[in-house]
């Protein structure tokens, strides 16, 4: 009985370690995107505020319209 419980606990630990690896890679990706333009929609990350892309850099949006300030 102890062997079955031990095997179950070891399996659960291995499974949780395997599941944690892709999440860490996703967190690194979002940290890298935070300062630059997002490639799929040419806008800056939402965490950087109201900004838009100009080339590969994020710039502030004008308050009165939706154009980028230079």
UniProtKB/Swiss-Prot annotation:
Propeptide residue numbers?
21-34
Q: What is its main location?
A: secreted
Report the leader peptide range. Answer: 1-20
Q: Which UniProt keywords apply?
A: Amidation, Disulfide bond, Knottin, Neurotoxin, Secreted, Signal, Toxin
**Which parts of the sequence carry Leucine amide?**
69
Report the GO molecular function annotations: toxin activity
What tissue expression does the UniProt record report for this protein?
Expressed by the venom gland.
Q: Which cysteines are joined by disulfide bonds?
A: 37-53, 44-58, 52-68
Which Gene Ontology terms of cellular component type are present? extracellular region
- Write out the annotated subcellular location: Secreted
Q: Is Plastid among the key words of this record?
A: no
What this chain does, per the record? Insect active toxin causing rapid but reversible paralysis in crickets. No activity shown in mammals. Does not show effect on mammalian voltage-gated calcium channels.
Q: What is known of its domains?
A: The presence of a 'disulfide through disulfide knot' structurally defines this protein as a knottin.
Q: Which family is annotated? A: Belongs to the neurotoxin 01 (U2-agtx) family.
Q: What is this protein called?
A: U2-agatoxin-Ao1m
